[in-house]
Amino acid sequence: MNIGSFVTNEKETYGIFFDDYAQSVTDNFIREYRNLREVIERKSTPLMYENALSTPKLKHNKIKFLPPIVNPTKIICIGMNYHKPYPVDGKSLSNPENIILFGKNSEALLAHNEILEIPAGDASDSFDYEGEIAVVIGTQARNVSVSNADDFIFGFSAFNDGSVRDWQSHSIYAGKNFSGSGSWGPWITPLEDLTDLRDLELTVFLNGEVVQKATSNDMIFSIQEQISYISSIMTLNPGDVIATGSPDGTGASFNPKRFLKAGDDLEIQVSNVGSLKNYI
């Protein structure tokens, strides 16, 4: 059962999602669990399901989607995790020997159905998309082994690591953190609802055309290896998000380049999870 956050009747809430409707938890439930991160942290999703199923059904077009977790403590992105040319200069590189990490601010990420913010000035000339599979942590993780990493996963979502390539060439952090340049959602699909983490399919559509396509099995470093490595450096907390890398097919990989422009439609689809749609 998919879970996420949204606004209804001008009130921020969270709950469960189905194909064409959502159901919010009650006000009493929110007084006990202020946000979805607390529900995950306290292992209370069964209680949340029971509570939300008792409330009215809300059509998707009657709510405003929010990022599934509105207050993650960390958003960690993985760089160069599929074999492809480096997106800034197009050079073909050998696979990295070690996992590459960088951070993303919550302010850089919008929700499903929102309009991405085109960076001002020259930064708009190299505004790019990167479709990714996102992992949401369910249990605090520190020094986790690869073999046990699945035990710390709560679920999965779709992610757009919006990037300004000209800025990325001199500062990864700057190029990856323009306000409103990326997104994630539309919801989180729990691990228990998925059968094979090695075969999650990622497909990205730009104006209806497939531009990126890969599976989780194509990753250089597996999801489990990523969790193990990150947890050897820092503590991963419930609700933390890991964006697991983007395959070839970003705008910078085309000749001529196909950077995002006003009027574009972007859709990032993860099989058995959902489709994240945004507009430019």
Would you name each region that the model predicts?
Residues 96-97, 101-105, 148-179, 217-222:
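Flexible glycine-rich active-site/ligand-binding loops centered on an Asp-His dyad
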Residues 7, 104-106, 113, 120, ...:
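Short, structured patches in soluble enzyme cores that scaffold and shape functional sites
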Residues 8-10, 49, 53-58, 85, ...:
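Catalytic-pocket segment enriched in acidic/His residues
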Residues 1-99, 209, 267:
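N-terminal non-catalytic cap/leader segment that marks the start of a structured domain
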Residues 93-112, 129, 261-272:
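Structural signature of FAD isoalloxazine-binding scaffolds in flavoprotein oxidoreductases
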